[in-house]
């Protein structure tokens, strides 16, 4: 979709209102108003605070105060997605059903490679997405101001003109979220960060760990995605995985497909030769990859076990037990607690996060690499981790 050039078409349409009588012209007027609404909404900025206030007012039944609008596109109805279930996230009756996706999009203004990855991810996601008429796809971006403008440009370029579903975009300021996260994740950063000043040392890369405390309570479920992805199926189908969570499960995540954690847990494995920790599937526990994560925020909020695992003393105890020192942020934390409490996790099929990186095959683990890397079935999401090219269509 190209950029809209101004409000002149809207003004002309409104000027003709008094003269238009026929049903045909009324339809033209409605179309013009829709264009005007999209231009107005596309130029707005909604902050995390204003979104929270609006959600709380809506749930309380009070009329929501005017807030800076989010980029929003309504394209009419669409045939029901296969296997789709109409579920109100508010617990009420029929009405709009929101589906939430979140992506990190920071330091993108002068990063052509990152913009190219985002273009591939968003183009494939939006091209294949199908939602019912009453469903809304909410795209959350965590970014600073410069990257926010880049994201807006990409979305105006990539939102298909005949999408057939409603799409809303919400931007969260990375600095604001970092301030909220730091007190929660400070203690774990030393165990799961590459070092001061490096990519994963920033608190924001532990967002998924504390998302349940950061997002408005009205958001019950959210899917967090990396940008180096390419979608091969309707993203609506991934939300159905929430229905397969067993009691006690709070996060859906795929296995790591390289012997990353065979390496990280080397000392624990040496001391415990019969352990499953770090071993390849299906018998082993290879750890997790955070490129695609389903976060049941309400279950995370209600889990006493998960709350305890966030305590600094608990993190230290497990890190000492497993001699754990990682550099992959939230992925390391989930992997470590998953060794101790696997029932917290719903394991996604590898086809939902088909990782392509083969770095560890060439760095000491060629003899066991295929046992980790093997993935059978039709790929639904490709993950071009460590800058690995993704197959063309």
Curated annotation (Swiss-Prot):
Location in the cell: Endoplasmic reticulum membrane
Main location: endoplasmic reticulum
Annotated keywords: Disulfide bond, Endoplasmic reticulum, Glycosyltransferase, Magnesium, Manganese, Membrane, Metal-binding, Signal-anchor, Transferase, Transmembrane, Transmembrane helix
Residues holding Mn(2+): 226, 228, 383
Residue ranges, annotated region (Interaction with target proteins): 263-266
Molecular function (Gene Ontology), one example: manganese ion binding
GO CC term (a single one): endoplasmic reticulum membrane
Transmembrane segments: 24-44
InterPro entries to which the protein is assigned, alphabetical: Glyco_trans_8, Nucleotide-diphossugar_trans, XXLT1
Domain of life: Eukaryota
Activity at various pH: Optimum pH is 7.2.
Protein's UniProt keywords contain Cell cycle: no
Cofactor binding, per record: Has the highest in vitro activity with 20 mM Mn(2+), a concentration entirely out of the physiological range. Can also utilize Mg(2+), suggesting this may be the physiological cofactor.
Keyword Mitochondrion among record annotations: no
Binding sites annotated in the UniProt record for UDP-alpha-D-xylose: 104-106, 227, 290, 328, 331
Cofactor(s) the protein needs: Mg(2+); Mn(2+)
Broad enzyme group: transferase
Catalytically driven reaction(s): 3-O-[alpha-D-xylosyl-(1->3)-beta-D-glucosyl]-L-seryl-[EGF-like domain protein] + UDP-alpha-D-xylose = 3-O-[alpha-D-xylosyl-(1->3)-alpha-D-xylosyl-(1->3)-beta-D-glucosyl]-L-seryl-[EGF-like domain protein] + UDP + H(+)
UniProt EC number: 2.4.2.62
S-S pairs: 350-375, 357-386
Family (UniProt): Belongs to the glycosyltransferase 8 family.
Function: Alpha-1,3-xylosyltransferase, which elongates the O-linked xylose-glucose disaccharide attached to EGF-like repeats in the extracellular domain of target proteins by catalyzing the addition of the second xylose. Known targets include Notch proteins and coagulation factors, such as F9.
Subunit structure: Homodimer. Dimer formation may be essential for the retention in endoplasmic reticulum.
Name the UniProt record assigns to this protein: Xyloside xylosyltransferase 1
Organism: Homo sapiens
């Amino acid at each position: 979709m190209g950029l809209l050039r101004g409000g002149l078409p809207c003004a002309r349409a409104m000027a003709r209102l008094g003269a238009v009588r026929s049903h045909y012209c009324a339809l033209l007027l409605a179309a013009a108003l829709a264009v005007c609404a999209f231009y107005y909404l596309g130029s707005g900025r909604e902050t995390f605070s204003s979104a929270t206030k609006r959600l709380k007012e809506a749930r309380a039944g009070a009329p929501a105060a005017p807030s800076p609008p989010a980029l929003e596109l309504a394209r009419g109805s669409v045939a029901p997605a296969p296997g789709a279930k109409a579920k109100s996230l508010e617990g009420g009756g029929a009405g709009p059903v929101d589906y939430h996706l979140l992506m990190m999009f920071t330091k993108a203004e002068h990063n052509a490679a990152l913009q190219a990855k985002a273009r591939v991810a968003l183009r494939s996601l939006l091209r294949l997405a199908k939602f019912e008429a009453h469903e809304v796809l909410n795209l959350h971006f965590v970014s600073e101001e410069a990257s926010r403008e880049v994201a807006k440009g990409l979305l105006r370029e990539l939102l298909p003109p005949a999408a057939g579903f409603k799409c809303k975009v919400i931007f969260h300021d990375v600095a604001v979220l970092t301030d909220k996260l730091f007190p929660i994740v400070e203690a774990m950063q030393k165990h799961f960060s590459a070092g001061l000043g490096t990519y994963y040392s920033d608190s924001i890369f532990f967002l998924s760990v504390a998302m349940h405390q950061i997002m408005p309570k009205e958001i019950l479920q959210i899917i967090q995605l990396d940008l180096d992805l390419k979608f091969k199926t309707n993203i609506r189908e991934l939300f159905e995985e929430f229905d397969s969570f067993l009691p006690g499960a709070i996060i859906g995540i795929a296995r790591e497909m390289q012997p990353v954690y065979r390496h990280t847990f080397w000392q624990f494995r040496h001391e415990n030769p019969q352990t499953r920790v770090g071993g390849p599937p299906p018998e082993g526990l290879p750890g997790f990859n955070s490129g695609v994560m389903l976060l049941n925020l309400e279950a995370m909020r209600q889990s006493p076990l998960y709350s305890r695992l966030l305590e600094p003393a608990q993190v230290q105890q497990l890190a000492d037990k497993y001699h754990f020192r990682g550099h992959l942020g939230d992925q390391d934390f989930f992997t470590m607690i998953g060794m101790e409490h696997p029932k917290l996790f719903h394991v996604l099929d590898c086809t939902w996060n088909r990782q392509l990186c083969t770095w560890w095959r060439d760095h000491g683990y060629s003899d066991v690499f295929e046992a980790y890397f093997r993935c059978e079935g039709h790929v639904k999401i490709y993950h071009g981790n460590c800058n690995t090219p993704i197959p063309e269509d």
